[in-house]
Amino acid sequence: MAVKISGVLKDGTGKPVQNCTIQLKAKRNSTTVVVNTLASENPDEAGRYSMDVEYGQYSVILLVEGFPPSHAGTITVYEDSQPGTLNDFLGAMTEDDARPEALRRFELMVEEVARNASAVAQNTAAAKKSASDASTSAREAATHAADAADSARAASTSAGQAASSAQSASSSAGTASTKATEASKSAAAAESSKSAAATSAGAAKTSETNASASLQSAATSASTATTKASEAATSARDAAASKEAAKSSETNASSSASSAASSATAAGNSAKAAKTSETNARSSETAAGQSASAAAGSKTAAASSASAASTSAGQASASATAAGKSAESAASSASTATTKAGEATEQASAAARSASAAKTSETNAKASETSAESSKTAAASSASSAASSASSASASKDEATRQASAAKSSATTASTKATEAAGSATAAAQSKSTAESAATRAETAAKRAEDIASAVALEDASTTKKGIVQLSSATNSTSETLAATPKAVKSAYDNAEKRLQKDQNGADIPDKGCFLNNINAVSKTDFADKRGMRYVRVNAPAGATSGKYYPVVVMRSAGSVSELASRVIITTATRTAGDPMNNCEFNGFVMPGGWTDRGRYAYGMFWQYQNNERAIHSIMMSNKGDDLRSVFYVDGAAFPVFAFIEDGLSISAPGADLVVNDTTYKFGATNPATECIAADVILDFKSGRGFYESHSLIVNDNLSCKKLFATDEIVARGGNQIRMIGGEYGALWRNDGAKTYLLLTNQGDVYGGWNTLRPFAIDNATGELVIGTKLSASLNGNALTATKLQTPRRVSGVEFDGSKDITLTAAHVAAFARRATDTYADADGGVPWNAESGAYNVTRSGDSYILVNFYTGVGSCRTLQMKAHYRNGGLFYRSSRDGYGFEEDWAEVYTSKNLPPESYPVGAPIPWPSDTVPSGYALMQGQAFDKSAYPKLAAAYPSGVIPDMRGWTIKGKPASGRAVLSQEQDGIKSHTHSASASSTDLGTKTTSSFDYGTKSTNNTGAHTHSVSGSTNSAGAHTHSLANVNTASANSGAGSASTRLSVVHNQNYATSSAGAHTHSLSGTAASAGAHAHTVGIGAHTHSVAIGSHGHTITVNAAGNAENTVKNIAFNYIVRLA
């Protein structure tokens, strides 16, 4: 039953991932799923997905549009798996998580050892088979040796018969010669057969060609025999090589099998060659038959047929001689085969290739025997052919008379045959040359065969000399003059079979541990016990907190050269995907060297689930006296951690600062690099997951990667520093020391050299930039140098290529004017209305003015003229109508200097800050004016007198009814004043004097009192103390001290005390004397001041006239 996997696919920000395809690729076969099959699921726009997944293991691949496929991980669906999200299955612990990397490697090594053991078993079986084949080969070699000897004897007999055949052929040739003489006589009597003789000549040529073919076939047989001799020699060398190969057959069975296959191929080739020899012999036989047939045909020849028969007999004799040589060559080949067979017998103890080589020798011997038999038959056929030719020559004498009567009918045929005969003659010459060359090679081969036969003789063989060798069945002999029999070979084979039985599979190895050590393999028991690597759990030290890093110390047992770099695997636990401490691992080697010459280094693979989840911070090592410890700094929240370490190493997490000689490894560090003492960061995992190494990565071959990041310079040495490939082109940045270039390759040769284009080059010394190709770009700025534009451009119709200046007239640029277009006189009416547009100088008496003429020549207003006088002396314009010219005079253009007439009406008083009156104006000083000359002014001032405004101000006409221009004299508005009198001194006045005198009373009332007795007891009282602060003080000098203590916020009362009495006695002092005041009644006094008056004086104040603050201006008036 399938398990449902569903959820929402989100990115790191929690947003749903869109346009994504989830693929599940089966990694192994299950009950319902076949390996490598693909299943797909497309989440909706909200990222939701739902899949019913069969049991099995799958690789999860995410395909996002526009990005390469991403491998998300591996999930395993079990029969008891619960439904969940894809994240749950990806984050679940797998079998690989439970089995550390080292154990996986152990299992791979076990499999490899098993494969090696299987290979050894196969090699053992092959060796046994090789031994068996060697035994069989030995037996067959002995048999073939006997057969080769028989073949040699047969070949010798064949050679004798061939010699006899040659003698018979020679005798036949003599007879043929005699018959030829008789045929000559017959030819003299047959003069009429000349034309028939031509035909016979053609037939004779054919006979010659056939005889040559026979000779060539015989030569081919000889050549074939020579080839067989060479092959026999090759077989001898192969047999010698087999002897050496047999010695190593037990340890290299595969090589033996290969050699045996090669020998089998050679045997097949020899068989093919023998078959070819047989075919050649049959061809020789056929050619001889053709020769006989041709000789029979010569009966129809005329007198020249006898000569042709004689020639044919000579060729037949040569063929017989060649056949004899062929027989000798066959005998030589047989002898060589006999020798090789003997050598094969010597090497009966050889392994697999020996048997094949012996088989090859047997085949060659049989082929040689067959070839010899064929040669013998061919020789007999050649002798028979020669005899037939001689008989035909004799018969041709009798047949000549009959041929004479047929000469006439043969005349026509003779002409045709003559042409054919010419071509046949040429071919015969070539065949003759080839036959002579073949005969020479046959003689050479025969000579070599004789040399070999004489060398072999019947002497005893040794390791340095060929000959006859004795057989022996001993299996423990060290003799070098005996040959092993099949019995001895079988004993050796049985011994090997017993040692390497196929069904033992290594069970017969006495000391398997020693065997594994010898082949440098690890036993399965060692793998099961995890020998070589230990699995260790390291718990958190006391007091470890999240966010700080704590040392996990991997320590060697001793600092010696026998303990160098150590393999370490350290990892945090598998947690939920959101846990930042999840699955952080380092797998590599560490080497703490302290300050020794061995140095310090580390390298390996670092993994973290996310690049910002750095559970393992770094690896620290001492730079002084500690050459034993490699310290991993781990986040306090990441414990416990798990490690695989080599035997001889220990691992621990100290609970405080670890001090080793001069080095201190800080406990609970925020930044171990700065807080540790006399220790350096060897690997800092701040760059995220990847392969780290503490020193440079140096490779002797290409280095390929997806992206290359660097925090410092990227240094490239050599001529071509950087090659960039895109499409069908390659581009190179090259610095050859003098210049830096951007170079390009030819199309389709992205890894090739650069082409001839030089688009970009910089002089390294001066920085000068050279662009060697066409530049197509939008550039701003100025060029320092330019010679000529590649494509000239037009400026207002004038071509410009940059090589020289150009001149543009006003007409080119449609300009109005650059200088004076022309000069006219004002007295002549100035510039005509239809003059050319431009700026004109118009002269008049004493000065000139500038006139600008705009002439279009079309429309209602065809001309506009404007003129200006110097020093802003006025601006005027006029325009024309159709073709009538100027119909109106100049009109003035008013400016800020020359205001228009409507600025101030005629007659209005205008304040003017100057005594100089502008033209058209007059001062207002009460003067009369000509009302007829200035009618507008007269309308303002009907009296014909301009008011005198000197010293006068202008007052708005009051509502009281005053007339315009009426005057008002000086006046002061009615007002009051306040006054005061000045101070007056009346002097000092006195009253009359009146003395009342002194009045007094008598002094009475003085008296005394007697005093006796005592006072009452009184004065008893208490005191209270409230809100007293607690305090204490010690004081003392020497050995004495006093302590005062006061208690805070407590009320105390003293005891009642102080009651007392007083005794009174004596006389009181005299007292009571006093006086009295006498009152005088209230009264007044009067002082009389006589009648008198006072004078008040008011002083003058003010200006000569009534005025306010003012500035003096002239009043002017516009006249017209």
Curated annotation (Swiss-Prot):
Xref: SUPFAM superfamilies: Carboxypeptidase regulatory domain-like (SSF49464), Receptor-binding domain of short tail fibre protein gp12 (SSF88874)
Biased amino acid composition, Polar residues: 985-1021
Family, per entry: Belongs to the tail fiber family.
GO molecular function, one term: structural molecule activity
Keyword Nucleus: no
Superkingdom assignment: Bacteria
Region of interest (Disordered), residue spans: 129-154, 221-442, 960-1021
Pfam family, one: phage_tail_N
Low complexity bias spans: 221-239, 248-395, 402-442
Listed name of the protein: Prophage side tail fiber protein homolog StfR
Keywords from the named record: Repeat
